[in-house]
């Protein structure tokens, strides 16, 4: 059986890094995504929550980056 999970802390760090490299503020990114809550982006970046798949696709487009370079996947075996 294959058991994977998304490392939300590292994924959040990737989102923050990509945003900063793009020269975008959190407010600007929020507006580009089309969401009303700035706190949502802060929560993603702190690793407290994951964006929806729709928002991940939008982030991938905004940053011109494949999803697998935004999302960090780990195997449960990595933590044993």
Regions found by a protein language model. Name each.
Residues 23-43:
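Short alpha-helical DNA-recognition segment
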Residues 1-21:
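A short, Lys/Arg-rich alpha-helix, primarily the initiator
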Residues 1-5, 61, 71-80:
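Short, charged recognition helix plus adjacent turn
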Residues 16, 27, 57:
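Residues within the helices of the helix-turn-helix
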Residues 54-69:
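DNA major-groove recognition helix of helix-turn-helix/homeodomain DNA-binding modules
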Residues 47-58, 77-79:
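Short, basic-rich loop-to-helix N-cap that marks the start of a DNA-contacting helix
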Residues 19, 30, 60:
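The alpha-helix within a helix-turn-helix
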């Amino acid at each position: 059986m294959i058991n994977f999970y998304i490392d939300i802390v590292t994924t959040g760090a990737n989102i923050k890094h990509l945003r900063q490299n793009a020269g975008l503020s959190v407010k600007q990114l929020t507006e580009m995504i089309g969401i009303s809550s700035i706190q949502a982006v802060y929560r993603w970046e702190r690793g407290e929550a994951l964006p929806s798949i729709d928002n991940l696709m939008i982030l991938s487009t905004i940053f011109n980056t494949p999803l697998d370079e935004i999302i960090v996947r780990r195997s449960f075996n990595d933590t044993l």
